C-alpha cells in the first residue's frame, strides 16, 4: 500500500493545488515512485502554470512534460522523479 501514482488537482485554487502537490510528491518520493501523473485539467491553465512553477523548484523532480495522446494530453503533467 504505497503512494498513488497520480493526483487530481482539478477544481482547486492554485494555492490548494500547490499544497496538495507538495504533499503528494513527498509521499511519492518516500514510496520510491519514479514516475507520477499530475491531473490539472485544461481550464484557464492557472493550475497547470502553478504546477510547472512548483516542479521547476522541487529538488526531487528530474523532469516533467505535458501528457501525450492517450495520457491526458495537456490536461496532465507526467513527472519523472529522481
Residue ranges and their predicted role:
Residues 1-82:
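Long, charged, low-complexity intrinsically disordered regions
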Amino acid at each position: 500500500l504505497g503512494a498513488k501514482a497520480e493526483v487530481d488537482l482539478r477544481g482547486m485554487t492554485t494555492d490548494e493545488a500547490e499544497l496538495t502537490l507538495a504533499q503528494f510528491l513527498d509521499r511519492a518520493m518516500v514510496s520510491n515512485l519514479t514516475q507520477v501523473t499530475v491531473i490539472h485539467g485544461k481550464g484557464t491553465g492557472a493550475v497547470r502554470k502553478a504546477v510547472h512553477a512548483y516542479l521547476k523548484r522541487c529538488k526531487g523532480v528530474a523532469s516533467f512534460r505535458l501528457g501525450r495522446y492517450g495520457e491526458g494530453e495537456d490536461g496532465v503533467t507526467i513527472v519523472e522523479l529522481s
